[in-house]
Amino acid sequence: MNDCIGKRLDKLINESQDEVLKRVVGQILEQNGKARISQDWVRRCGDDFNLTAVELALRCLPVAACYASAPVSHFNVGAVAVGQSGAFYFGANQEFSGDAVQQTVHAEQSAVSHAWLAGEVALTDMVVNYTPCGHCRQFMNELNSADRLQIHLPHSRNNRLHSYLPDAFGPKDLNISRVLFDPQPHSFGFTHADPLVQAAADAAEQAYAPYSRALSGVALQVGTQSITGRYAENAAFNPSFLPLQCALNYRRLSGLSDVPVSRIVMAESQGGLSHRSITEQLAHSYLGLEIEYFAL
């Protein structure tokens, strides 16, 4: 686990008088920094402290914010996505100094992407320590649960997403019925002997790109492990989430941000656009690596 994240978590335990917070941090440390909590643990902790799932998620926000990386804004945002399964998926904002602001990962994007890669089928609630910005409201409007997603803040609970985004423009306006978190039945018939290349291609098959059809996936060699990310497109285009950010986010929230990345593989289908250039830019500026690119 990243030393900075570990120090922040230790500080929470040492300085907080909140026994719930201490229990959550203890569980995260026991998991070697993996920033997600199973539905069984959520239920047991809620029962022990007589808290609803949303009340518990609100108490988790300082823990989620420990995963933020904000060298530009110095403004740490934490989020907790509550899955239909009942599991919690933490998220936090991540900025990349020296690169374009468009490369930034927003906390809500982080939590949503975390849940998506972990195999969650839908989200019921988004809990965040600051009001979602317009970018994130539009991003969450792409979810298969957007019509019923509840937003909870420390000062305001039980608000539907669409109360923050009235008269919203989204996938339905473009006749898209299979949306983010729905199964994406793509198949390229691509096979490769290199497991990391195959992992990138497999990630691209699960990407969501109904507008451009430019499906893309990234695979990172992180020590002995591989971490993948996939593209999540948005009807408004600019809030789309890129595959390298998706993979880096999952690496950080899996407690592996201190393990060096030695290879980056990108696999992409031909569509109305390409993310090769912007991915190469971040790979070079943030990781000092060149990507290995494969056209599908």
From Swiss-Prot:
Enzyme Commission number(s) from the entry: 3.5.4.5
Cofactor: Zn(2+)
Protein name as catalogued: Cytidine deaminase
Entry similarity comment: Belongs to the cytidine and deoxycytidylate deaminase family.
Species in which this protein is naturally found: Actinobacillus succinogenes (strain ATCC 55618 / DSM 22257 / CCUG 43843 / 130Z)
Active-site positions on this chain: E108 (proton donor)
Binding-site list for Zn(2+): H106, C133, C136
Domain of life according to the entry: Bacteria
Keyword RNA-binding appears in the UniProt entry: no
Binding partners and assembly: Homodimer.
GO molecular function: cytidine deaminase activity; identical protein binding; zinc ion binding
Job description of the protein: This enzyme scavenges exogenous and endogenous cytidine and 2'-deoxycytidine for UMP synthesis.
PROSITE patterns linked to this entry: CYT_DCMP_DEAMINASES_1, CYT_DCMP_DEAMINASES_2
Catalytic activity from the UniProt record: cytidine + H2O + H(+) = uridine + NH4(+); 2'-deoxycytidine + H2O + H(+) = 2'-deoxyuridine + NH4(+)
NCBIfam families with a match to the protein in the record: PRK09027.1
Record-listed substrate binding positions: N93, Q94, E95
Record domain CMP/dCMP-type deaminase: where: 52-172, 191-296
SUPFAM superfamilies, alphabetized: Cytidine deaminase-like (SSF53927)
UniProt remark on cofactor binding: Binds 1 zinc ion.
The keyword Transmembrane belongs to this UniProt entry's keyword annotation: no
UniProt keyword terms in alphabetical order: Hydrolase, Metal-binding, Zinc
One GO BP: cytidine deamination
GO cellular component: cytosol
